[in-house]
């Protein structure tokens, strides 16, 4: 089952986090068919250099699109969704590091349940050092719990979502 990974980066992103994030996407046990990276406005030279290095090293995997000015995460992602080649899209933030099995686990859920339209998961958060976990963000897992939770706030950790 082929899918796209959608990411948006802007000038304030930490270059080291971007590298760690891209490495974690590339080292998945199930590979994405494409990584759609939206440059949300002009970036620093260091961020541009990292994106160019990965685009060159993994030619054909990365599809990079540039917005002339920063429009914010929501609009940048909407722009990116329109450029994804596949109906199934995995979201990633450029400061997130995912476990190697994330895409495999999610794709398997879509294979098992043909009516599934979205799945996500918990996150472990860090402040500066990815090896030092500062907390966890757990979300409801059942449909009933999701519907109840959604009355108060978003029941999904958006950066963990894979959806059609």
Residue spans for each PLM region:
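Nucleotide-sugar donor-binding/catalytic module of glycosyltransferases
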Residues: 1-164
């Amino acid at each position: 089952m082929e899918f796209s990974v959608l990411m948006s980066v802007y000038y304030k992103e930490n270059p080291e986090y971007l590298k760690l994030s891209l490495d974690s996407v590339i080292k998945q046990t199930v590979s994405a068919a494409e990584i759609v990276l939206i440059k949300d406005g002009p970036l620093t030279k260091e961020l541009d250099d990292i994106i160019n290095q990965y685009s060159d090293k993994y030619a054909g995997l990365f599809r990079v699109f540039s917005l002339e000015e920063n429009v914010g995460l929501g609009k940048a992602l909407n722009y990116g969704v329109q450029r994804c080649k596949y109906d199934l899209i995995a979201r990633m933030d450029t400061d997130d590091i995912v476990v190697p099995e994330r895409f495999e686990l999610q794709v398997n859920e879509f294979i098992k349940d043909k009516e599934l339209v979205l799945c996500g998961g918990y996150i472990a958060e860090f402040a500066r050092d990815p090896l030092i976990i500062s907390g966890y963000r757990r979300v409801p897992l059942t449909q009933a719990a999701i519907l109840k939770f959604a009355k108060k706030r978003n029941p999904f950790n958006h950066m963990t979502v894979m959806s059609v």
